[in-house]
Swiss-Prot record:
Organism of origin: Mycobacterium sp. (strain JLS)
Listed InterPro entries: DNA_glyclase/AP_lyase_DNA-bd (IPR015886), DNA_glyclase_Znf_dom_DNA_BS (IPR015887), Formamido-pyr_DNA_Glyclase (IPR020629), FPG_cat (IPR012319), MutM-like_N-ter (IPR035937), Ribosomal_uS13-like_H2TH (IPR010979), Znf_DNA_glyclase/AP_lyase (IPR000214), Znf_FPG/IleRS (IPR010663)
Cofactor annotation comment: Binds 1 zinc ion per subunit.
Cofactor list: Zn(2+)
Keyword Cell membrane applies: no
Molecular function terms, GO-annotated: 8-oxo-7,8-dihydroguanine DNA N-glycosylase activity; class I DNA-(apurinic or apyrimidinic site) endonuclease activity; damaged DNA binding; zinc ion binding
Name under which the protein is recorded: Formamidopyrimidine-DNA glycosylase
Amino acid sequence: MPELPEVEVVRRGLDAHVTGKAITAVRVHHPRAVRRHEAGPADLTARLLGMRITGTGRRGKYLWLTLDGGDEPLARRAESSVALVVHLGMSGQMLLGPIPKEDHLRIAALLDDGTALSFVDQRTFGGWLLADLVTVDGTDVPVPVAHVARDPLDPRFDRDAVVKVLRGKHSEIKRQLLDQTVVSGIGNIYADEALWRAKVNGARLAESLTKPKLAEILDHAADVMRDALGQGGTSFDSLYVNVNGESGYFDRSLDAYGREGEPCRRCGAIMRREKFMNRSSFYCPRCQPRPRVRRA
């Protein structure tokens, strides 16, 4: 699943190419892609026509385009506090360029300068919906995103406040890093990378870690995601691409994730993989020893 860096790469690409442009045509090729828009495909299509894209936003793994009524009458401009929310799911792609002729095209839109915007999604977990914007903690976000915490790359991210929350959690630190209501955007890959950099096993209880160590983990999470962003994100297959259809290459720089059986880049011990929450965790048994189980 695309994590924060991959979604931010897509947001930046869209921001540079679609902001200020009006939507002139929309076609939903598969109803599942708009299942989260409760009023249905016809409503979404009708409301999008003529709307102008005024900007882009992101919170964690959620992406949206802010909209207004463009050149429509004032009555239509009441939609100015609306956003087109895009969830990429496991394999969603927002592509600019000729509309692709392929089986996984779910939605296609045309803009007033002739630009085509396509939503391609092989596994169909992603989709589009229109949602009202609400102000949460001084920031306008779509209603479906209102519950999502700020992410470590957000300028208003309060690291100390998150550390305080983590100190009160009687559960594994990795589980908390993946909880989007605590801190958003840190998915499985970047959680493993941050924990490796901090020399902390993901099975450690959050409450057992000191405030400085928790702050260090969050700082590493921010750093590794900035590093990934600089390399276009992480692509293990062709499913994650930017708006031009290009893959990221941060997978070549990963220190933990996907490196089972390989030597730790820091100490040389053989990296291990364990099952965790229907996922896999990768860690160094020497640098990141598992917590001891207390016997009764």
